[in-house]
């Protein structure tokens, strides 16, 4: 058994939403978490900048002798996961979008109207839509960017009227105009406001990729042990 730690990284605090699921389902695993709070948010930065930051962090994690890198950041996963795999072929590198897309495609019924919310970079990449519809073309996918969410969450502005009003600003028209029945939290920061979203839109089915990725991590560990 490989007892080395698993490396997680994100642009800031968002990737921490994966950790409780890891501790519950894979309690024997050690974790190194790198949150780039000095340079957050990534969601409005240029692709080359995101790629450069991600290479630096992955290099740090590889030098820390991790056995796997988990990109607990949708923006990075949408931008440069393949670049990271080419740069560091010696260890598995797992992005968060593919496991989430697989789960969405497999669990949502035909004709479901699925809304993806995320950063500007994630949404403009179309990564979720492509990955989901490649597996289940009968699903209707709609996407919208919510760029103010991450800065507010990083500042701890969560359980108050400011966050609720911001959620409604981005999501009211999006949900109504597209008749959305399912929302995918396409940024690992967004589980911090999942309770807000569920309270404001009680009829929505909410899918949280931060809880889904653990199953794929387990599969990779089992394959390599």
Predicted regions and their residues:
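Non-catalytic structural scaffold of enzyme domains
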Residues: 1-225
